[in-house]
């Protein structure tokens, strides 16, 4: 992101609302457990070592925000299954990126498990920021530009052309 950019005009940024839902460790640990197939309250509690009241409030919040679904079990309506929704599955790359960041920069205990591609049996690559054509981008190659509400595919700004977006980026950097 090279030269400093004025970001005061980004009140509509979605990062604060995402952090409101997922911005504390138990939420991501519950997400990780759900990715690993855990579905029931007791199993989340046993796996994570989380207090019942905290687990209960986090599950309620994750259901309210559409990250998990809450479904009574057919065989016993008193028992509930919590499963990832499409919205929750959309958080998996963020969870993996946070884990990879922690593995690289944290001084905690080393990870004892790898995330592996089932087909190839190889560890996944590091999460990266990719260009539209698949190139890995560095921080100095990125630039925030204003985009009309609800349109974040890059085509909405600058008439949909790469030239228009480059021009907007140059303008944002130069002030």
Feature roles, as predicted:
Residues 1-22, 157-159, 165-174:
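N-terminal leader segment of winged-helix/HTH proteins
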Residues 13-54:
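N-terminal helix-turn-helix DNA-binding core of bacterial DNA-binding proteins
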Residues 23, 74-95:
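Basic, amphipathic "hinge/linker" alpha-helix immediately C-terminal to the N-terminal HTH DNA-binding motif
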Residues 42, 60, 80:
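Residues within the helices of the helix-turn-helix
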Residues 46, 59-60, 64:
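Residue-level detection of the helix-turn-helix DNA-binding "recognition helix"
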Residues 63-78:
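Beta-hairpin "wing" of winged helix-turn-helix
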Residues 96, 100-175:
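C-terminal regulatory/oligomerization modules of transcriptional regulators
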């Amino acid at each position: 992101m090279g030269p400093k950019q004025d970001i005061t005009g980004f009140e509509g940024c979605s990062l604060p609302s995402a952090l409101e839902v997922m911005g504390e460790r138990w939420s991501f640990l519950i997400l990780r457990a759900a990715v690993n197939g855990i579905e029931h309250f007791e199993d989340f509690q046993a796996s994570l070592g989380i207090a019942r009241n905290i687990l209960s409030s986090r599950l309620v919040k994750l259901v309210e925000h559409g990250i998990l679904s809450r479904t009574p079990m057919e065989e016993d309506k008193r028992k509930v299954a919590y499963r990832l929704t499409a919205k929750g599955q959309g958080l998996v790359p963020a969870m993996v990126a946070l884990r990879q960041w922690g593995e690289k920069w944290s001084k905690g205990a080393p990870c004892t498990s790898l995330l592996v591609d089932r087909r190839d049996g190889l560890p996944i690559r590091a999460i990266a920021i990719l260009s539209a054509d698949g190139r890995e981008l560095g921080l100095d190659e990125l630039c925030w530009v204003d985009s009309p509400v609800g349109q974040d595919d890059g085509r909405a700004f600058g008439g949909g052309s790469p030239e228009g977006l480059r021009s907007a980026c140059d303008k944002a950097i130069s002030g």
